[in-house]
């Protein structure tokens, strides 16, 4: 018994003294700053439910200005959190190739079949071929325009519901309507039919939400392999396997239905296009399982990003009546006495585009980017990020977008006017504004996401005036983290009334 106690005490002493001993020796110069760490868990105890906020606070605490990089230590993996646009430039442009890989995680391995999609696959020939396939045949500008009718029909469907509700003077759960609309548009484009609650398939939305939550979860085994058993005990492995099985079976049924239908169709969706490419592929061997993963990725990126963004857009506009009035006046200039604002007119609306940019500045689709992995030493500014251990780099777009040195003293406030004279776009060329990333890993479906958001917001603001009865929360109040996305903890409940100039 004494021997067991002695061994246990020695083990605990090692855990707590080992970090102290390491602090007295330096194996690499110019390491990024790191807050005080506990053994095993690093400084995970200092993180809140919203890690992007915690990392920004820790960075500001350690440096007099914005910390270019912050180091965490849940060993044997190390993470770097970049909160500076200058260092983000070095990561995503100067050293883009060195940071082009993705780390392998348990969620990616189980749900994404080891990362054989575009977003999570390792950089190499397979990734290049998959990205080329998607950008050329699925996500090109011409393809985006070809689905204009789908967007118009689903937006019009929401308008009809809002008109009916406005006559009753009752509030509407706008978040619920926007979620259904986003799901319906993405599903019709991807697989040719709806899977909304109205189709008695609400489980589809629940399964998508589970995938997003699991992809953004924290499996202990990813960082501390010796403690991987904890993930099994808390049921994380089982949840990942179950949701993976559900989507494999669902998407396989969808693909088989398209195969059985053949080419005798009036309209083609993404599955049809991919099946055609499956037969044409020569040098690049596209497999049926790859089709399932591409469609799953489009569901995840398209549905969640689109819904989160348009929900934030409507929330911010409703909370800022002066911005809503300016937006209505601009839209009325282009679309006076029309029942629907078409996409060709939306292209010319500068204030609308400024509103969308401001939404993405304050609430980027992923506050922390999908992590990048490094395999060799890189010098970023005055810091050396070493190879040898597993290095994972996160770009904190949320923090960069709120840097007062770039965006001024009112960086936390919703001010679309700031974008009217700034030549910013979503392509990641200005590293102070990177809502969709930059470089080789730039999000490929920007046009699909932004088009639905722009035309949807334009029509909902053009056709209706909006008000909320309860005291509006602050723009960042009531948040919840759902995997890699940050959305409202509470739905947007608002009162629509027909705008006078549309009657």
Swiss-Prot record:
GO terms for cellular component: membrane. PROSITE patterns: CYTOCHROME_P450. Heme binds at residue 443. Pfam families: p450. Its EC number is 1.14.-.-. It is an enzyme of class 1 (oxidoreductase). GO terms for molecular function: heme binding; iron ion binding; monooxygenase activity; oxidoreductase activity, acting on paired donors, with incorporation or reduction of molecular oxygen. Keywords: Heme, Iron, Membrane, Metal-binding, Monooxygenase, Oxidoreductase, Transmembrane, Transmembrane helix. It comes from the Eukaryota. The keyword Iron applies. SUPFAM superfamilies: Cytochrome P450. InterPro entries: Cyt_P450 (IPR001128), Cyt_P450_CS (IPR017972), Cyt_P450_E_grp-I (IPR002401), Cyt_P450_sf (IPR036396). It is found in: Membrane. The chain crosses the membrane at residues 1-21. Its cofactor is heme. It is a single-pass membrane protein. Belongs to the cytochrome P450 family. This is Putative cytochrome P450 71A28. It comes from Arabidopsis thaliana.
């Amino acid at each position: 018994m004494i021997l067991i106690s002695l061994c246990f005490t020695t083990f605990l002493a090692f855990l707590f003294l080992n970090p102290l001993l390491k602090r007295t020796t330096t194996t690499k110069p110019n390491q990024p700053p790191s807050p005080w760490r506990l053994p095993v868990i690093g400084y995970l105890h200092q993180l809140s439910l919203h890690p992007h906020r915690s990392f920004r606070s820790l960075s500001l605490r350690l440096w007099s200005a914005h910390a270019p990089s912050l180091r965490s230590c849940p060993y044997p993996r190390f993470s770097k959190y970049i909160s500076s646009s200058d260092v983000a430039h070095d990561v995503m442009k100067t050293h883009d190739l060195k940071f082009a890989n993705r780390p392998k995680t348990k969620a990616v391995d189980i749900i994404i079949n080891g990362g054989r999609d575009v977003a999570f696959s390792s950089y190499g020939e397979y990734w290049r071929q998959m990205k080329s396939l998607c950008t050329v045949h699925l996500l090109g500008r011409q393809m985006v325009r070809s689905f204009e009718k789908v967007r118009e029909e689903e937006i019009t469907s929401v308008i009809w519901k809002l008109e009916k509700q406005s006559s009753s003077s009752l509030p509407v759960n706008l978040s619920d309507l926007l979620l259904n609309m986003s799901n319906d548009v993405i599903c019709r484009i991807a697989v040719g039919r709806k899977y909304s609650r109205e189709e008695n398939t609400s489980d589809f939305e629940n399964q998508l939400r589970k995938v997003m939550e699991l992809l953004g979860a924290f499996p202990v085994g990813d960082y501390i392999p010796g403690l991987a058993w904890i993930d099994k005990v808390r049921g994380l492995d089982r949840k990942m396997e179950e949701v993976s099985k559900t989507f494999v079976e669902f998407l396989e049924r969808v693909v088989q239905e398209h195969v059985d239908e053949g080419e005798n169709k009036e309209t083609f969706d993404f599955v049809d296009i991919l099946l055609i490419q499956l037969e044409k592929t020569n040098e690049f061997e596209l497999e049926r399982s790859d089709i399932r993963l591409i469609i799953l990725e489009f569901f995840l990126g398209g549905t969640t990003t689109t819904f989160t963004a348009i929900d934030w857009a409507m929330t911010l506009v409703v909370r800022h009546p002066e911005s809503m009035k300016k937006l209505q006046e601009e839209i009325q200039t282009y679309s006076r006495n029309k029942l629907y604002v078409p996409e060709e007119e939306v292209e010319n609306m500068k204030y609308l585009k400024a509103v969308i940019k401001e939404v993405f500045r304050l609430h980027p689709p992923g506050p922390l980017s999908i992590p990048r992995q490094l395999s060799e030493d890189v010098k970023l500014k005055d810091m050396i990020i070493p190879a040898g251990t597993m290095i994972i780099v996160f770009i904190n777009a949320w923090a960069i977008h709120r840097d007062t040195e770039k965006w001024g003293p009112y960086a936390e406030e919703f001010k679309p006017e700031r974008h009217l004279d700034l030549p910013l776009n979503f392509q990641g060329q200005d590293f102070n504004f990177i809502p969709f990333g930059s470089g080789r890993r730039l999000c490929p479906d920007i046009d699909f996401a932004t088009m639905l958001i722009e035309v949807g917001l334009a029509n909902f603001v053009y056709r209706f005036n909006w008000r909320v009865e309860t005291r509006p929360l602050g723009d960042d109040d009531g948040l919840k983290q759902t995997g890699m996305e940050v959305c409202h903890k509470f739905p947007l409940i608002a009162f629509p009334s027909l705008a006078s100039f549309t009657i």
